[in-house]
């Protein structure tokens, strides 16, 4: 279905810089997210007919309710999207709208960059559709402002069409998903639903209830610096220790060499001097046993290197970040089956695959609200080649509307 305000709403949202900050100690991590919630979303949520719209200062979520209008629809269903965008330039976002995409390269503003089917063959799936792209200097922010726009548009449509019967709907727009902390303080009691969906997926038909289990790893390497001219048998180069550590990780277990259900170790940062160095990794896997094995391997590697050095010069810090929500959701597949049924009713082929990442739904599911993920439309997210199809966004609205009407 065509929704008149969807494109305008989406463009308005993405023009606001809501980039999160991984080094911040506050929640939300940036003031721009607070301003977006209070100055943009809150008045609009109230204007389209949501009730009890309130901002939770302790966690940065803006929440609202659309009461049920049919006694026989007794479920309470939530829809969640995140306000922040990823770690890429988000200042001065200037979206381009390509009507009736005919194929071929898309020039991204005056940046000199091209969005090319040779590089991104999925572009060929969107012939004849309306695409929104960047101008090549920023990301777009479809992750996840497409989700916010879709949820808002669905609510607006229901309020404007009161003869459409629906269950109670609660919506929540939150901070800091991209830096992995947004759902840490999610208020389950305040949200009070039977189950929920994050509208944070990619292409048409995505329906996901499996995520990685995730850990963060920080490693400190303690060296000993002496003059290189007299270093034999005395110098311990901390940077060399970091290199040796990394080279003992399985070469095939890297993001660029894995897919499907394969896990990995991913080096994010390595810096230092001869005297002291540090590296940061993320560790990902799907199954409990293999996730535990990866962490155990790290501990054993550090111990092995320290034994060889004769002292503790490799110091590790491992922190679990989130877990595969399949463990929770498979106990009651109602939200997955409901979304699947709605997609099939709309002639959308459900693509049920694991998320090679995480969503806020991972943590929220373990807090007691099963929260699978449905598509929002974004492609090539987190960079200058990001784009979204308006037609896919419209179908995401259709799915939301279908879910809340199901008995």
UniProtKB/Swiss-Prot annotation:
Task: Tell me any Pfam family this protein matches.
Answer: M20_dimer
Has UniProt tagged this entry with the keyword Metal-binding?
A: yes
Q: Which InterPro entries match?
A: ArgE/DapE_CS, Bact_exopeptidase_dim_dom, Peptidase_M20, Peptidase_M20_dimer, Peptidase_M20B
Q: Which residues form a coiled coil?
A: none
What this protein catalyses is: Release of the N-terminal residue from a tripeptide
Provide the cofactor list for this protein: Zn(2+)
A cellular-component GO term for this protein: cytosol
Cofactor remark = Binds 2 Zn(2+) ions per subunit.
Where is it mostly found?
cytoplasm
Q: Where in the cell is it found?
A: Cytoplasm
Enzyme Commission number, as recorded? 3.4.11.4
- State the similarity comment: Belongs to the peptidase M20B family.
Q: HAMAP family from the entry?
A: Aminopeptidase_M20 (MF_00550)
Please give the name of this protein: Peptidase T
Native species = Streptococcus uberis (strain ATCC BAA-854 / 0140J)
Q: What is the lineage of its organism?
A: Bacteria, Bacillati, Bacillota, Bacilli, Lactobacillales
């Amino acid at each position: 279905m065509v929704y008149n305000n969807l494109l305008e709403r989406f463009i308005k949202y993405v023009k606001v810089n809501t980039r999160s900050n991984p080094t911040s100690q506050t929640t939300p991590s940036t003031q721009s997210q607070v301003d977006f919630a209070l100055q943009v979303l809150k008045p609009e949520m109230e204007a389209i007919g949501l009730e009890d719209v309130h901002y939770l200062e302790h966690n940065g979520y803006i929440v609202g309710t659309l009461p049920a209008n049919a006694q026989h629809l007794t479920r309470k269903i939530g829809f969640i999207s995140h306000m922040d965008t990823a770690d890429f330039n988000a200042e001065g976002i200037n979206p381009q709208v390509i009507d009736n995409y005919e194929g071929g390269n898309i020039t991204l503003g005056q940046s000199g960059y091209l969005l090319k089917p040779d590089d991104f063959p999925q572009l060929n799936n969107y012939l004849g559709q309306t695409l929104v792209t960047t101008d090549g200097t920023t990301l777009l922010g479809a992750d996840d402002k497409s989700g916010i726009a879709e949820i808002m548009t669905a609510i607006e449509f229901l309020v404007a069409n009161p003869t459409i019967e629906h269950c109670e709907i609660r919506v929540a727009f939150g901070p800091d998903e991209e830096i992995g902390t947004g759902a840490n303080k999610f208020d389950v009691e305040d949200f009070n639903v039977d189950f929920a969906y994050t509208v944070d997926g990619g292409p048409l038909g995505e329906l996901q209830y499996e995520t990685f289990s995730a850990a963060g790893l920080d490693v400190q390497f303690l060296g000993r610096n002496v003059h290189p001219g007299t270093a034999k048998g005395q110098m311990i180069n901390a940077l060399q220790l970091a290199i040796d550590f990394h080279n003992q990780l399985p070469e095939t277990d890297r993001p660029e060499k894995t897919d499907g259900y394969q896990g990995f170790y991913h080096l994010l940062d390595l810096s230092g001097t001869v005297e002291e160095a540090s590296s940061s990794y993320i560790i990902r896997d799907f199954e409990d046993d293999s996730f535990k094995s990866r962490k155990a391997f790290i501990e054993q590697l550090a111990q092995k290197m320290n034994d060889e050095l004769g002292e503790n010069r490799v110091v590790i810090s491992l922190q679990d970040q989130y877990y595969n929500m399949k463990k929770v959701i498979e106990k009651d597949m109602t939200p997955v089956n409901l979304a699947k049924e709605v997609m099939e009713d709309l002639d959308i082929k459900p693509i049920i695959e694991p998320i090679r990442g995480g969503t806020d739904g991972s943590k929220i599911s373990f807090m007691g609200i099963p929260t699978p993920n449905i598509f929002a439309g974004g492609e090539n997210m987190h960079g200058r080649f990001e784009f979204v199809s308006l037609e896919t966004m419209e179908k995401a609205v259709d799915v939301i509307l279908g879910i809340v009407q199901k008995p």
